[in-house]
UniProtKB/Swiss-Prot annotation:
It is a multi-pass membrane protein. It comes from Rhodospirillum rubrum (strain ATCC 11170 / ATH 1.1.1 / DSM 467 / LMG 4362 / NCIMB 8255 / S1). One of its GO terms (cellular component) is plasma membrane. Its main location: membrane. It is found in: Cell membrane. This is UPF0391 membrane protein Rru_A0119. It comes from the Bacteria.
Length: 56
């Protein structure tokens, strides 16, 4: 349990450094682009799944 607490502490410190350092704005715009890319890939994957014929 202590290991997880230390891991989350390190992650929080790194996130704070990014947030207070001004890198968060650039990272947020990249994250938005990646979100929409993966959303499109999800929709394509679902369409392919439901239109695929069963090969039994």
């Amino acid at each position: 349990m202590l290991t997880w607490a230390l891991i989350f502490l390190v992650v929080a410190v790194v996130a704070a450094l990014f947030g207070f350092g001004g890198i968060a704005g650039a990272a947020a715009s990249i994250a938005q682009i990646l979100f929409f890319v993966f959303l499109v890939l999800l929709v394509i994957s679902l369409i392919m799944h439901f239109t695929r014929r069963s090969r039994l």
